[in-house]
Each structure stands twice: as C-alpha cells, then as structure tokens.
Amino acid sequence: MTLHSLASMTLVTLLALAPAAAHAAHLKEQPRRHRVVYHLSEAGVDKARFVLGNIHNTISGVGGAGNVEAIELVVHGPALKTFVTAGMDPQLKALLTEVQGQGVVFGACGNTMKGFSLTLDQLPPGAHPLPQGGVVRIMELVEQGYVYLRP
C-alpha cells in the first residue's frame, strides 16, 4: 500500500465518521427535556404525598426543572377529595405548591368534580379542570409522547 492510498483511505474514513461525531456532539449540547404525566386516583394524604415526592425526585433526578419540558399530575376519583383546600393537609399543600413552582400542572378530572359536586375554587390555586375527564387527558398526553407514571 502506498502512502498516497493510505492517506486517501484515512480521509475517506474520517469523512464517513464526521456526521456521527457531529450528531454525538449535538446530543451532548442539547440535554433531553422530559415530558411526564403522573396519574393519581387513590385517596389519602400519604399516597398524595408519596406521588408529589416522586414528582419532586423526578425533577431533581434529571438535573432540575430546566431539563423538564412538562410534568402534569392528573388527579381523579377519590384522590381529588384529598386536594380540597378546606382541611387540606398543610404538608401536602406545601409539596404541591413547591412542584407547581417548578412548572408542574395540576389537572383535576371534570367528571370527578361533577360527581363529587366540587368547584374549582375548592381546589388548590393553579388547578386546571379537565372537562373531558382525567383518563382522556392521560390518554392524550401518552399519545403525544409523555411518559406515563402511576406510583
């Protein structure tokens, strides 16, 4: 093999690898931004605290809210009564306020609200009613590529 052919092969190899190297460098520069939907339907303060703790840990685990595109907590069924502000557990309220401050959306099932005769003003500030229902909202988010978690 001549020096000229060796140099030509080296050049061809480098040109072939350049796009892969550029793609790998781009991935390092652009951290993945996560989209997650959390599903809560079980009643009880302990369960709600556990789920909000999971949300907090998710945000911390990916390096902070800057690496999260969206997290939505969809609450329906008996779990929604846990979030009625009159008599709401203070620690639960503080946890919810903390994760909402990091961009977490609190979605309240419209069917559950109707079934339990709840109004939006009875729920924590920032709660979003889901008129189509909590399960339908979860389905829509999963279809949009959200990771589904039900701790």
Map each language-model feature to its residues.
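Short, structurally constrained coil/turn elements
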Residues: 18, 65-67, 100, 123
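Short internal beta-strands
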Residues: 71-76, 107-110
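Bacterial N-terminal signal peptides
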Residues: 9-18
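N-terminal secretory signal peptides
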Residues: 25-72, 81-82
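Bacterial N-terminal signal peptides that target proteins for export
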Residues: 1-10
